Amino acid sequence: MKRFLTATALLSALVLTACSDPGAGPAANAGPGEWPDPTAKLDGVELTIWAAQNSNTVPKEVVSAFEKATGASVKIDTIPDPYEQSIQTRVATGDLPDLAFWQPTASMLTAINAPSKLQSLEGAPWIDELDPALRDITGILDGTRYAALVTSPAVIGVYYNKKVFAEHGVTAPPANFAELVDLGRKLKGEGVTPFYEMGGDRWATQWAVQVQLADAVKDGFWEKLNEGKESFESPVMLDAIRTYQGMVKEGLYNDDIVTATFEDQGDALMSGKAAMVFQVNSFFGQLQAKADTAELNDTIGFFPISPSGHVGMVIPDQSNALVAFRTGDATREAAARQLLSFWMGQGYADFVADRQTVSLKSGVDSPAGVPQALLDVHASLPDSVGSMQALAVANPDLYINLADMLAGEMTPEEVASTTQDQFEQLAKAAGK
C-alpha cells in the first residue's frame, strides 16, 4: 500500500530537521567521494540500510551477493510507518544509517536536508549505463545527485480491464482526457461502472486531478508554482478539481466512493466490476498478489492520459531509490558508495531477475516474467512529465482535501485554497 505524509506530519518533520544539532554530523555541502572497486574487500565493515515495510525485501539478494563478494556485513532495518516521518525524526536526533530507501523527489530531498545529511552521488559509475531517458529523471536537488534510482519509477495513468473494453467494443485507448470521459459515459450507459475510486483510503484521489495538469506541467506549471507565479487556485488546477467532482456527480464512479478502499479498487478492476482506475505502480503490485503474470496480461492494461494525448506523470516513491548518508565515518561512507556501485553494476542483472522488475539499464534486459502492463508503464517514462510530488518544492494535502470534497465537506474552491495555504506553509518551513 502506498502511503503519503500529511502536511502536518511533514511540517513537524521539517521543523525537527531544521532544528537538529549542526554539530552532530559532518559539515554541509561536501563534494562527491571516490568510487571504490565494487568488489574491493571490506572485511570487518558493517553497514546498515533502512527500509520501509514494502521495500525491506528489495535489497535482500543483492546485499547477500555483495557480502559474499566483499566480506562486508549489511543489516537491513525495517523502519515503522509512517516511514518518512520516522526517518526524519531519527535523522534530526543524529541517528543515521549508512543507506536508506528514500523518495528521490526534490521536495523529499529537501525534507531530509540533503546537502548536509546525504552523500553526493556525482560521478557514479553506472549513470552512463542507464537508459538516457532515466538518467536525470529524479534524485537530483539543485544540480547535485543524491539518490540512486534502482527500480522503474511510478507513473500516474489509467489501468483498465481488457475484457470489459473488449466486451463493449473498445479497441484502443481514448486519444485524450476528454475522450476518456466520453468513454466513461458510454460505458455507464451500457451498465458498467466506468471508474473506481478508493475514497476511504484517500491517497489516490489526487491522480484524476494530476493527470489533467500534464500539458500545463509541460509549460512549467510546477516551476511557476514554486516561484509564486501560479497557485493551487490557478484556473488550470481549479478546473481539474471541478472536472473530477463533475465526473463523480455524473455517476461515472462507484457508488461507495467515500468508503471504498485500496483493496476494493483492486478487486473491482480485476473482476470487471469497474472498467478503469487512475493509479500508480503500487496498485499493480496489489494485482500481482491476486493473479499470476498470464492472467494479468490477459486482464489488465495501462495507458497514460493527458488533456492533449498520452502523457503520463512520474511519481517516484521510496521503494525506487536509495540515498547514502554522511555519517562522518569515511570507511563506511566509501563502503556505502561501493554497495551502490555493486548493486547497479555487476549485481544489477541478478537483481532485476530476482525482483522480476523492469531493467533501467540499456545493456540489461528485463526478465521475461515482467507483466506487459508494467512494461507499458516503463515505456511511457520518456514522454512523461513530473508530478506534484516530483517537482513541487512542497507537497500539501491535496489528496486529503479531495477526499473531503468527495465526502461533501469541501467545495472545489475550498480544496484549492486550503491546499495552497498548506503549500505555502510547507515551502516556508523548508526555506523555499
Show which residues each predicted segment covers:
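Extracytoplasmic "Venus flytrap"/periplasmic binding protein-like
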Residues: A65-A133, A166-H168, A172-A175, A275-M276, ...
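Conserved C-terminal helix/tail region of periplasmic/extracytoplasmic solute-binding proteins
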Residues: A166, A349-D350, S362, H378-K432
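Extracytoplasmic/periplasmic substrate-recognition and gating elements
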Residues: T93, H168, E250, A289-D354
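Hinge/lid segment of periplasmic solute-binding proteins
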Residues: G33-K41, T105-I156, A208, G301-F302
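A structural signal for short loop-to-beta-strand junctions that line the ligand-binding cleft
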Residues: T89-R90, P97-D98, D128-F165, T193-P194, ...
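Periplasmic solute-binding protein
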Residues: I112-A114, R135-P173, V181, G200-L225, ...
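Short, low-complexity disordered leader/linker segments with a strong preference
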Residues: M1-E46, E424-K432
